[in-house]
Every structure is written in structure tokens, then in C-alpha cells.
Amino acid sequence: MGDRSEGPGPTRPGPPGIGPEGPLGQLLRRHRSPSPTRGGQEPRRVRRRVLVQQEEEVVSGSPSGPRGDRSEGPGPTRPGPPGIGPEGPLGQLLRRHRSPSPTRGGQEPRRVRRRVLVQQEEEVVSGSPSGPRGDRSEGPGPTRPGPPGIGPEGPLGQLLRRHRSPSPTRGGQEPRRVRRRVLVQQEEEVVSGSPSGPRGDRSEGPGPTRPGPPGIGPEGPLGQLLRRHRSPSPTRGGQEPRRVRRRVLVQQEEEVVSGSPSGPRGDRSEGPGPTRPGPPGIGPEGPLGQLLRRHRSPSPTRGGQEPRRVRRRVLVQQEEEVVSGSPSGPRGDRSEGPGPTRPGPPGIGPEGPLGQLLRRHRSPSPTRGGQEPRRVRRRVLVQQEEEVVSGSPSGPRGDRSEGPGPTRPGPPGIGPEGPLGQLLRRHRSPSPTRGGQEPRRVRRRVLVQQEEEVVSGSPSGPLRPRPRPPARSLREWLLRIRDHFEPPTVTTQRQSVYIEEEEDED
């Protein structure tokens, strides 16, 4: 056995047809000098995936001091990264120290989940008959001459050549597919009895103390919709147990399929080297900074007239569930105040197209008066999806940013001029999807659902049962006992409004 183990090297040189020195040997050789993706003349498929995920969960009773003191500290102590942190582009969305919020003040137990996901996937499939082969193939040429039939120099060699000079993702006219995905998600759940002070005190502070960002905050387009300090709401006053879920999802996906018919390769390969030396974390400057920058000039998705497909999706969802007996006063007193105190936004608020559906102060409603146990679920879903398929045959970016303002005013309810306009505005100047004559498809969906379930025997007001005389017989007494233990009446009301808008522009 020892003789057999020593001999395979010299005693089995391999046949001329299939062995390492035969026609297939040169094809299957794996020790190509420069790199498996850059050296030799072999076809390649390269996939790169970068995934950054941050998840945070807070379970707290927040026994803190005054709200003003809490809002002053977090600024300097949590500066955040330049890409996504509180001071970056997504900071206003994920800012965590809003003082008068029902989840921040008092001692209410809360559970907050925040998730930030940044993912990039790149796939390159190329043959790229680029530049002079001699420079790159000097080493492999004489050392791997190969047979004339199948090897690298034979009929299949030209097919499998891989010597693309600059980089698999940046040089030549290599067909490539690049996907970038940015996902920011925030979910907040509150379970509370809200043992707070008078309603007036709570509603006075939020104005100046929460100016909010221009995009999504309380003073922005979604502020009126997601405002949490409406005084007469059944979930704000008293000590009613409630469960509130809010979810904000911002997602962007970009796909590029291109051959990059741009200028000389040398010019393109010279710039990216020194200007993009490689990230310490993920992006060239910060952990996520350069990855999320959309207007890099030499990027394969920005230069030339490369066909590309960009999808952006913004989803805002709020779900509220109230389980309460509402031991409140007369109905008339509750319905008088909300009218002037909650004017609402023109688009989605109580005075807009969805206001009648979301009005919560209807006096004769079975869920407002008396002490009836009830469960109310409200769900508001605002979604916009934008898809751009373009070759970007436009002029300078500065000229591109001037036109979209007046030419795309948007609808009064949801468009750029309505309550969601600041969030969904599409004419940011340096963005590749904003200017020129790019064909695009825009879908907007607004879904408002309200479900109300009432379990009532309501011993209140005029619904209180009349006193009955004592039973005169055993049979009558048994019938009354059966009626008493029968399941109560359950009334369920569902209302839904769905608005969908689709726009195609060439």
C-alpha cells in the first residue's frame, strides 16, 4: 500500500485527451495568476452582497423627569452616523426623543422596535473583449499554450476569455446587473392606561416643543394624520387601556442593466481608484454614507445613457386598538369641542376626503355613550410606489430641476401639494429619476379601514333595562336566568375606503 500511495504522481501522467496536460486540462486549470474574476481570459459571474442590519427594542416604564429636560439631552449624546443616524437623512424619521408623545412621557410601558436594513447586491456577467490582451495574458500565454482543439487557444478559448481590464463592475462594456435596496422600518407598540393630567395641559405643549421635520414629522405632511394628541379621542383621555401600533416603512430598490457605452475605459478607471479607495465599514466615507449617495458622477447607474429601473416605496401604516368602557360624561359635551379644535389637513384630515370616515366624535354612536365594552380597530395605510425605466437622455441636472415644480403640481389630496407632498416630492434636482424625459410609472394607494366591535348590554342611560317584578313561578325564573347567561349581542361595523391612482408619463 505504501508503494501505491507514493506513485500516483509520476506513474499516472494522464492521457493526452483528458488529463491535466490534455485538451481539457488547460480549460480546467484553476491557478490563473491575476484573479479568478479578473485574470486570464475566462467568463465570470460575480455576485456581491452587503447587508447591514440594526435592530433595537426598548421595553420601559420611562420614570423620567420633566419632558423638557429629556428632549435637551439626547441631541449631543446621540449624534448618530452620517448616513442613517439621528443627524443624517433618516434621522428626522427615527428621532426618538419627542417629548410629549404618549410613549415618551409618564410611566407607560412601551415596546419600540426599530430596524434599519441596507442591502446591496451586484451581479456581473461579462465577456468584455476589451483593451490589449498582451499585457494581461503574458504570463498565462506561454505557460498554458493548450491544444488546438479545446483549450484556451482553441475554438472554445475565445468564448471563455476573461481579461477585462479595469474592474468587473466599472470597466469596458460589460453587461451587468446592480441591485441596491434600502429599508428603514420603525414599529412602535404602546400598552397603556394613560394616567396623565388634564387634556388641556397635554395639548398645549406639543406645538412649540415638537416642530418636527419637513418630511415626515408632526409638522410635515403626515403630521396631521399621525398626530397623537387629539384631546377628545377615546384613546387619549381617561385611563382606557389601549394598544397602538405605528409602522413606518421606507424602501428603495434600484436595478441597473447596462453595457455602459461611455467614454474611454482608461478615463473611467482612473477616477474611481483614488476617489473611491474602499470603505472602512461599507461606504467610502462612513458606514453607510457613500452607499446611500445617489449622485456620484462616475457611478455605473449615473453616467451615460444606461437603461435602469428604479423603484421607490413609501409605506405609512397606523393601527390602533381600543378596549374600553368609556365612563365619560354626557355625549353632548364630548361632541361640542372636537369641531373647532381639530380642523385637520385638507387632504386626509377630518375636513378632507377621508375625514368623514375617520371622524371619531359621532354623538349617537354606540361606542361613544354609556359604559359599553367595545373594541375599536382603525388602520390607515398610505403607500406610494414609483417605477422609472429610463435611459436619461436629458440635459444638465440644473436645468432638469427647474421644470418639474410647475409642471407636476400633483393632485390636491395626496400629490406634492397635498398633505403627503413633502414626503413624496419627486423633483429633487440631482436625482437620476427626476429630470429629463424619463418615462415613469407612479402608483399611489391610500387605504383607510375602520372596524368597530361593540359588545353591549349597556346599563347606561335610556338603554338601561326596566326593572321587572319578581318571578311568579319557577319556570319564569329559569327563563330569566337563561336570558341573563346568554352571550351578549355583538355588533361589528366595517368601513373601508380605497383610493388608487396610476400615472404614466413619457
Curated annotation (Swiss-Prot):
Major subcellular site: host cell
Post-translational modification: Phosphorylated by the cellular protein kinase cdc2.
Record GO cellular component, one term: host cell nucleus
Residue ranges, annotated region (Disordered): 1-470, 485-506
Protein family according to the UniProt entry: Belongs to the lymphocryptovirus EBNA-LP family.
Protein name per UniProt: Epstein-Barr nuclear antigen leader protein
Cited InterPro entries: Herpes_LP (IPR005030)
Any one GO MF annotation of this record: transcription coactivator activity
Phosphoserine sites (modified residues): S35
Superkingdom to which the source organism belongs: Viruses
Subcellular location: Host nucleus
GO biological-process terms attached to the record: DNA-templated viral transcription; symbiont-mediated disruption of host cell PML body
Keywords: Activator, Host nucleus, Host-virus interaction, Phosphoprotein, Transcription, Transcription regulation
Impact when changing S35A: 95% loss of phosphorylation
Oligomer and partners: Homooligomer. Interacts with host SP100; this interaction is important for EBNA-LP coactivator activity. Interacts with host HAX1, ERR1 and HSPA2. Interacts with host PRKDC and AKAP8L; these interactions modulate the coactivator function of EBNA-LP.
Role description: Plays an important role in the establishment of B-cell immortalization by acting as an EBNA2 coactivator. This transcriptional activation preferentially enhances the expression of the major viral protein LMP1. The interaction between EBNA-LP and host SP100 correlates with coactivation of EBNA2 and the relocalization of SP100 from PML nuclear bodies into nucleoplasm.
Taxon lineage: Viruses, Duplodnaviria, Heunggongvirae, Peploviricota, Herviviricetes
